């Protein structure tokens, strides 16, 4: 059984002005997502600024989300690290809290070989044998690209490595991955502008930044495709492209947090080294939000 089908939000982590995590606001965001048909919550991923959290904050935020969601939708916890030992520790803790699955990014900076990636993911999976793992491939951010044969080896040989969040942007590579891994692989788009192409390759949904500001529309796009209304799904995908482009005109999550603040959601600042959005880009973002029909505060 798939971890989820449809639209999973890579949710932001709201902050107070002093940079501390705003758990009251996080609860509001979780309720907003669930009320608007979100199919899964992905907590402490790239969009959640996990890379600037302490381990204590990271784990507290994961536990908070799991407890507040309370099984209404799956909660997938980001527990990846470029240190295998740290990833194992984070994964074991998240599993003990009741995470429905783990999202584990490829190791970054230290440039593991494909052999090293197999060892890394196998060690993590063996430490949490009852918890499903989704691998996360985003080479533009990590400098590490997990190859199709490596994905296939892992999903075929490690029982709880089940999925891939594909954010390479390379549809040929993704198609080859599907070809090699076959039915063993649960595939999710990691790029909001490639949802329908990846669904057409057998994908089950999207782990989405766009969903922070447009959860219902993103959910509807995936559902329409799965129900056979490809024209309806394509219209949503095409209509969303200007907004998606605006949400990535600076590095994620700068634009999406800015967008939520423009919408009156008051998610607070970013943590350094991320910084406030350029004013010219903010104006582009405002227009894209309004053109998509999103009301600003």
Predicted regions and their residues:
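Gly/Ser/Thr-rich beta-alpha loop segments that engage phosphate groups in nucleotides
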Residues: 8, 47-50, 80-82, 165, ...
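Active-site beta->alpha loop and helix N-cap motifs at the rims of alpha/beta catalytic domains
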Residues: 2-9, 13-145, 153
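Glycine-rich phosphate-binding "P-loop"
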Residues: 137-138, 160-161, 271-272
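Short, amphipathic alpha-helical "lid/cap" segments that border enzyme active or binding sites
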Residues: 23, 27-30, 148, 282, ...
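A general structural signal for well-ordered alpha-helical segments in protein cores
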Residues: 26, 58, 62, 87, ...
């Amino acid at each position: 059984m798939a971890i989820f089908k449809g639209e999973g939000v890579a949710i932001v982590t709201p902050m107070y002005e002093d940079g501390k995590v705003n758990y009251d606001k996080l609860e509001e965001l979780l309720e907003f997502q669930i009320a608007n048909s979100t199919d899964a919550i992905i907590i402490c991923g790239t969009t959640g600024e996990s890379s600037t959290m302490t381990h204590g904050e990271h784990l507290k935020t994961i536990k908070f989300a799991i407890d507040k969601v309370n099984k209404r939708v799956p909660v997938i916890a980001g527990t990846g690290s470029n240190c295998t030992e740290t990833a194992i520790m984070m994964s074991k803790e998240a599993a003990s809290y009741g995470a429905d699955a783990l999202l584990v990014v490829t190791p970054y900076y230290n440039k593991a070989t494909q052999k090293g990636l197999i060892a890394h993911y196998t060690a993590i999976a063996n430490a949490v044998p009852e918890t499903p793992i989704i691998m996360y491939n985003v080479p533009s951010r990590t400098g590490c690209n997990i190859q199709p044969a490596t994905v296939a080896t892992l999903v075929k040989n490690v029982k709880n490595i089940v999925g891939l969040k594909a954010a390479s942007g390379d549809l040929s590579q993704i198609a080859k991955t599907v070809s090699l891994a076959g039915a063993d692989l649960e595939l999710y788009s990691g790029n909001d502008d490639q949802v329908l192409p990846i669904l057409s390759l057998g994908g089950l949904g999207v782990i989405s930044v766009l969903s922070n500001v447009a959860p219902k529309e993103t959910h509807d796009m995936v559902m329409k495709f799965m129900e056979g209304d490809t024209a309806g799904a394509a219209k949503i995908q095409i209509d969303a492209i200007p907004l998606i482009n605006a949400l990535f005109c600076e590095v994620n999550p700068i634009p999406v947090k800015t967008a939520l603040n423009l919408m009156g959601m008051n998610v607070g600042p970013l943590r350094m080294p991320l910084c406030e959005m350029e004013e010219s880009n903010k104006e582009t973002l405002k227009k894209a939000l309004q053109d998509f029909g999103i009301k600003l505060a």
